C-alpha cells in the first residue's frame, strides 16, 4: 500500500536502487520515480547527533546481507554520510562497516565508500 509522504531514492551513475522480484536490485536512472525505487529511513537514535537508520521499502527492511525482511528487528542499521563538495552521499552498514554500492545491475557492500545521489520524492 502506498502512503503519502516523503520518500528517498538512491542512484549511482545511470542506475537507481530498486526492488526487483522481492530482492534489492537496480533500474535505469531515468524518467519518473516508481514505487519500487522509493525507500524510507527509520531513525534508530536517541540523541539528535545519532546517525543510525533502518532502511525500509514498503513493509520490508533491508538486512545486512542486502535481502529484505518484514521483521524490523532483523533489519540492518545504516549510517548516512554526506561526502562533501557535491560528491553525493554514502550509506554504511554498521555491523560490517561496509558501504552500499551500485555496480551496474548489482547491489553490494564494499569496503570503500561509494557515491550515491539521494533524491527526496513526495507522492
Task: Identify the residue ranges that each predicted region occupies.
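Lectin-like carbohydrate-binding module/patch detector with strong preference for beta-trefoil
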Residues: 1-123
Amino acid at each position: 500500500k502506498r502512503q503519502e509522504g516523503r520518500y528517498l531514492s538512491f542512484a549511482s551513475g545511470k542506475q537507481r536502487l530498486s526492488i526487483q522480484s522481492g530482492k534489492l536490485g537496480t533500474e535505469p536512472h531515468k524518467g519518473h520515480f516508481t514505487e519500487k525505487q522509493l525507500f524510507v529511513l527509520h531513525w534508530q537514535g536517541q540523541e539528535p547527533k545519532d546517525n543510525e537508520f533502518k532502511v525500509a521499502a514498503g513493509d520490508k527492511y533491508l538486512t545486512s546481507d542486502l535481502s529484505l525482511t518484514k521483521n524490523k528487528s532483523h533489519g540492518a542499521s545504516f549510517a548516512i554520510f554526506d561526502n562533501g563538495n557535491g560528491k553525493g552521499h554514502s550509506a554504511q552498514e554498521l555491523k560490517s562497516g561496509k558501504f552500499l554500492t551500485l555496480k551496474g545491475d548489482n547491489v553490494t557492500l564494499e569496503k570503500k565508500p561509494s557515491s550515491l545521489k539521494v533524491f527526496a520524492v513526495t507522492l
